[in-house]
């Protein structure tokens, strides 16, 4: 248990979807800072690490199935550096928010989380909705802007502004978000 949890959203991705062409270059830019953030979270006694990933409509899929599909997908190089370790907390989701129809809020409350770092993809979709759901649950939100990837640069920038202004999210870097 710690005061801070890092939630990695939707990074187990096959990159075989209509938005992949626009998304891939942006994900490529965040892999190193995100991998560093994940590595620091894994080794810290003061940070909890949770992966939440879309189940892509496969309600029978285990998290390991989703990871396997991502590693077999079009861009395994964007997946390998950030694959969750065997002892990592993982869960699947069915919609944009990592909170919707998941046990995330329950888990974070059990861990006594006081601060939530949200990283992953897509900034203007799943990151935004997860941040909003965290905010309405009274979790202070931190967004490492170099560890989130968007599809549309203009919408992603607007989403970051909305999170900062409307949700009091702290916008920082992956290197600085854990202190």
Regions found by a protein language model. Give the residues of each.
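Active-site-adjacent betaalpha module
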Residues: 1-5, 36-46, 67-179
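A short alpha/beta connector and helix-capping loop motif
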Residues: 20-41, 45-51
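Short beta-strand segments at enzyme active-site cores
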Residues: 47-54, 59, 144
């Amino acid at each position: 248990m710690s005061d801070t949890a890092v939630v990695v959203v939707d990074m187990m991705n096959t990159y075989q979807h209509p938005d992949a062409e626009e998304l891939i270059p942006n994900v490529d830019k965040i892999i190193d800072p995100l991998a560093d953030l994940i590595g620091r979270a894994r080794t810290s006694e003061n940070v909890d690490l949770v992966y939440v990933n879309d189940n892509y409509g496969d309600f029978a899929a285990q998290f390991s199935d989703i990871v396997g599909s991502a590693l077999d997908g079009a861009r395994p190089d964007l997946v390998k550096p950030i694959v969750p370790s065997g002892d990592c907390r993982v869960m699947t989701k069915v919609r944009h928010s990592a909170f919707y129809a998941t046990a995330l809020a329950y888990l974070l409350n059990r861990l006594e989380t006081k601060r939530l770092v949200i990283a992953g993809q897509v900034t203007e979709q799943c990151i935004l909705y997860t941040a909003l759901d965290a905010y309405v649950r009274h979790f202070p939100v931190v967004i490492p802007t170099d560890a989130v990837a968007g599809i549309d640069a203009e919408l992603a920038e607007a989403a970051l502004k909305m999170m900062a202004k409307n949700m009091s999210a702290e916008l920082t870097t992956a290197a600085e978000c854990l202190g």
